[in-house]
């Protein structure tokens, strides 16, 4: 064996489709044989096992408002090539790093709209949940944005609340 063959670590691709819930993401990692069980993944992703993701600005800005899962909406959908011999923290951190990289460019746009990243994540979750099909996302997004920007009293007090995100 060559030296590179001796130290080569096994990798695998893990694909997280858009719209996958945190529980669904955890199940994908379990099914891939990378994590022992769903609860282990979710406890890490939510920080309830002591895992610290404070290196990410977004993590520190997620409100502690009693939501069921802090991680919901932040586990970035992507195809990841990961080492098969890592711990759960590595997998979650990889996804949070991708989320931070992909959303960094949106910070100014989100701030200009007078909202927070957390509200933007919840709105995106609403849109995906309501649309059901990716082809309907634009129509549903326009509808939600029109309602949120409306002066109509029916929508003026609207708060972003979702079973998935709250």
Where are these predicted regions, by residue range?
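Conserved catalytic or metal-liganding residues and their short signature motifs at active sites
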Residues: 1-159
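Low-complexity, Pro/Ser/Thr
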Residues: 164-165
């Amino acid at each position: 064996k060559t030296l590179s063959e001796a130290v080569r670590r096994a990798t695998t691709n893990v694909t997280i489709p858009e719209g996958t819930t945190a529980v669904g993401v955890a199940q994908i990692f379990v099914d891939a044989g990378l994590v022992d069980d769903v609860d282990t993944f979710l406890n890490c992703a939510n920080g309830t096992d002591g895992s610290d993701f404070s290196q990410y600005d977004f993590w520190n800005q997620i409100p502690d408002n009693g939501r069921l899962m802090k991680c919901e909406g932040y586990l970035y959908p992507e195809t990841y090539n990961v080492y098969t011999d890592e711990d759960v923290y590595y997998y979650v951190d990889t996804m949070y790093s991708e989320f931070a990289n992909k959303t960094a460019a949106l910070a100014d746009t989100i701030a200009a709209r007078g909202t927070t990243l957390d509200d933007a994540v919840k709105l995106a979750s609403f849109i995906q949940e309501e649309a059901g099909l990716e082809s309907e996302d634009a129509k549903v997004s326009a509808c939600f944005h029109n309602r949120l920007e409306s002066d109509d009293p029916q929508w003026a007090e609207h708060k972003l609340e979702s079973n998935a995100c709250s």
